[in-house]
Amino acid sequence: MRKKGVGLAAVLAMATVAVPSSAEVIYKLDTQCSLKGAAPVSCAVEATNEADATLYRHQIGSQLVTIRISDAPIRMAMWDAKAKQWQSLKRASARFSSNTICFNGRELCVVNPNYLNSVREDNPAATAKRDLVRVHFGADGRIDASCYDDGCEVMQK
């Protein structure tokens, strides 16, 4: 069972998040990631289902960045290792043509065709002939706005 958000969320730090024995590994992926707009580098992604969320652990060199996507209601958060707590994401975006997902602008970007293909499979009507989807989250971590392609330019005005 994969949990996804609407669009991107529907479309995705040094974490010390342990994987409980009840966690189910969905997949592992060797891919490319970038932090804070830097050039992409090799990274490994592990997706695991847990009680009420899916965790995406991104191992980038010595750094581990974890994104949590939870359902009911859909929320996305990033683990803040210094504060030792989850921080709600402010925004996320996905570009289907490059299989790239970015969180909080370009704080973390990852090439992840596994996730985006599953988003397309689970939301064929919403994602048909779409390339870009952006999601904005409110202070409570819930989606408060989303847009596709040229509609994202309208939202910025």
Short names for language-model regions:
Residues 1-8:
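Bacterial N-terminal signal peptides that target proteins for export
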Residues 18-20:
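N-terminal signal peptide c-region/cleavage motif recognized by signal peptidases
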Residues 9-16:
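Bacterial N-terminal signal peptides
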Residues 23-157:
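Cysteine-centric segments in proteins
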